């Protein structure tokens, strides 16, 4: 098990370096497009957005690469069957609650108000406010964690009812859930600390935190699985240890900015009630997205064994670009937009959104097409070893192609949704999310029960729903005048379109020259995959350069 890990790890540096060069070039080009736009752009530059985004994206890239190391090891050891399905469900449930309590509704309500306290009342008031909010969050999550541990079998039955037909799978999932559920408390407190650090422009430390979970899971998978019965239980404990590491790692940085305080309860505090008031609709909005994921798991639990795992591994691949760019942009834009709104700088607010949208389109469009075209090489190179069979690889490829449809929409939502949250308008995204949820279920029924798409139909429904969500958010921002596009969008999009067409043609041509992807060892497959990725990057950015895409062109107001 250690040898494939070493081979994969050896190639990690070149992949990260390549990704960093591509990202750096795109960031410089996009940000430079606003040079010379007057006082508003100088205000944007003062925020050090480029530096912050590059730092967060680079650290996130490392975390995602380690995540692939983790998933490759897990696929080799556990394959795609009863054990892996049980772990995916047991890990998904606390993650869903984490997104609701911490990274979702809570951060949407907490960050703008914390930024307001810091800007208008000073750091002492912000520190007291943080202590009160931390106390309330700790109490609520402790109760939720206790209920989750005690009610694990009922939670499994509610979220994966198809597992009830197999007693072994049901019991294993329940046991894993009891171990992983306390992760919700640890990671939510970690996310709270990260939100404070982001507000103080300490973006890199919270961005590095997910790496610790991956390190914990890799260590347990490689060295401790023989000591657990069944071996998959090692991964449950790895999640719990990872949660502890994620929280503890950030505390010294919190102390450094003078915000390390003991949680306190004060339900009479006006700021706490403002957060609770904002969290009401925010929880509903975030819950809509998580309910959609739960419903997808319910559908998948009735499909053939392995369906949950196939969707999981495909989703992990899609999460690489979504995490490196989407999470980084969302992390930086929310506090930046909140500050612009608090200072009533309408022009800077709109330009921040335009900057994010251009960057998303420039990087998400080629990534989405590359995921679809390179689905077979990606799955075979990263996962098709050991117990992960050729059939598992083929099923995962179908899910990845379906997921890739929604990558652009997912990334756009990461930019557009903060445009509402920063204005403390959570109701609009909630209404849109509820409509999107309803349409997702219509598509689930159509793609799974009417059309023979099985698990790929569930992935396709998620992707199309993300595009619908992004489209509606964009329409609302434009209709309310919160966002006014900068000049040059039409030519910008046309040139990107031509560049991605050339990239796809190059990739398809090279694929015809490659031997079968189920032959050769991991190192050989990764070398071939790296060659394809490099060819795609060169053809895409080379085409843009041939069409006049130059850094000096971004010194004008008209972009491209």
Region locations from a protein language model:
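Membrane-embedded alpha-helical bundles of multi-pass transporters/translocases
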Residues: 41-560
């Amino acid at each position: 098990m250690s040898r494939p890990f070493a081979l994969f790890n050896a190639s990690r540096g070149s992949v990260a370096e390549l990704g960093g060069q591509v990202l750096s070039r795109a960031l410089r080009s996009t940000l430079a497009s606003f040079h010379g736009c007057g006082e508003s752009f100088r205000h944007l530059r003062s925020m050090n957005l480029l530096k912050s985004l590059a730092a967060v994206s680079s650290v996130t890239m490392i975390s995602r690469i380690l995540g692939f190391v983790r998933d490759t090891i897990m696929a080799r050891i556990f394959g795609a069957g009863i054990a892996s399905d049980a772990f995916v469900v047991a890990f998904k449930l606390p993650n869903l609650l984490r997104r609701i309590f911490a990274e979702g509704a809570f951060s949407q309500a907490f960050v703008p108000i914390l930024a307001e306290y810091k800007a208008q009342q000073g750091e002492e008031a912000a520190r007291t406010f943080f202590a009160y909010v931390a106390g309330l969050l700790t109490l609520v999550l402790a109760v939720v964690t206790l209920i989750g541990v005690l009610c694990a079998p009922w939670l499994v039955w509610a979220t994966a009812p198809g597992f009830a037909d197999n007693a072994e799978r049901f019991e294993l999932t329940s046991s894993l859930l009891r171990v992983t559920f306390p992760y919700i408390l640890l990671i939510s407190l970690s996310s709270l600390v990260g939100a404070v650090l982001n507000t103080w422009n300490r973006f890199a430390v919270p961005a590095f935190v997910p790496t610790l979970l991956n390190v914990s899971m890799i260590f347990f998978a490689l060295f401790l699985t023989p000591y657990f019965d069944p071996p998959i239980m090692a991964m449950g404990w790895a999640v719990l240890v990872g949660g502890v590491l994620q929280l503890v790692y950030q505390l010294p940085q919190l102390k450094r900015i003078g915000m390390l305080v003991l949680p306190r309860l004060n339900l009479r505090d006006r700021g706490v009630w403002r957060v609770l008031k904002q969290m009401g609709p925010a929880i509903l909005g975030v819950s809509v997205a998580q309910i959609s994921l739960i419903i997808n798991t319910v559908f998948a639990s009735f499909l053939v064994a392995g369906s949950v795992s196939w969707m999981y591994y495909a989703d992990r691949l899609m999460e690489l670009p979504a995490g490196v760019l989407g999470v980084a942009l969302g992390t930086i834009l929310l506090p930046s937009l909140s500050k612009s709104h608090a200072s009533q700088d309408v022009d800077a607010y709109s330009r921040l959104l335009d900057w994010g949208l251009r960057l998303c389109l420039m990087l998400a469009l080629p990534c989405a097409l590359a995921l679809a075209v390179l689905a077979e090489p990606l799955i075979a190179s990263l996962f098709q070893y050991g117990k992960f069979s050729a059939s598992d690889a083929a099923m995962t490829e179908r899910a990845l192609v379906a997921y890739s449809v929604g990558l652009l929409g997912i990334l756009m939502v990461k930019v557009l949704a903060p445009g509402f949250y920063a204005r403390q308008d959570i109701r609009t995204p909630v209404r849109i999310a509820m409509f999107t949820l309803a349409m997702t279920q219509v598509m689930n029924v159509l793609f799974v029960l009417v059309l023979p798409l099985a698990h790929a139909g569930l992935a396709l429904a998620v992707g199309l729903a993300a595009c619908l969500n992004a489209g509606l958010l964009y329409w609302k921002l434009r209709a309310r005048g919160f966002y006014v596009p900068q000049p040059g969008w039409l030519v910008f999009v046309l040139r990107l379109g031509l560049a991605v067409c050339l990239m796809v043609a190059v990739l398809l041509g090279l694929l015809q020259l490659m031997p079968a992807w189920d032959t050769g060892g991991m190192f050989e497959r990764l070398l071939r995959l790296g060659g394809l990725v490099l060819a795609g990057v060169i053809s895409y950015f080379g085409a843009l350069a041939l069409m006049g895409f130059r850094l000096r062109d971004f010194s004008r107001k008209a972009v491209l």
